[in-house]
């Protein structure tokens, strides 16, 4: 690494970005069971099991509410088609609450299969790293003391922007994992809503939201692939320009590319909902 402070600051900012990007690549290919050694998943599964008893009790409540809403009188419930429909709904709701964790794991596995297919088709095993061009390093190292003063300001601003964008992006990806854990913990309560026709929209909304959370990983991977293709052709640097101009031009174009990826990652949830109607 160069001994120049300006170069070191930019390289440290790019190192932070590359580390967070590599961490994202690992996170989107990781299952909730393996995340952080599985300790969080174990706690959520324990909560899921405890909440399941509440879900089973709510099935009865939602079922009675549904019967009272759809059947005007007790005589209506005696009709075979109505009774069979109510029984099937009750049985399916109980199955959803009892086997909800397995159903959610199956949905997540399908989404992870999609992520793996996208990565294999694109031929990417890891994201492309952002590297400071040699021309900029040479130009900055050749600057005198007074010439380097404006470079300090430009470097501080650029380094701060790159670092902030890195943490915004990684926080969004971690937020996806936390949402999946929250869905896992309270799933029995939401699944119990399928027992009643008036409340089934709660269960449908829950399943759609969980599916959208799973599919966010595919959108994030696509964003990383797009950024990697951008990073494969680094910003063009004019070797005849002043050092401060070269650095400012490089940082400006790099931050624009970073904003594309950060924006894609942050909008992954909305993009999935708009594309899939979830």
Feature roles, as predicted:
Residues 44-52, 84-88, 92, 141, ...:
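Alpha-helical membrane-interface segments at transmembrane helix boundaries
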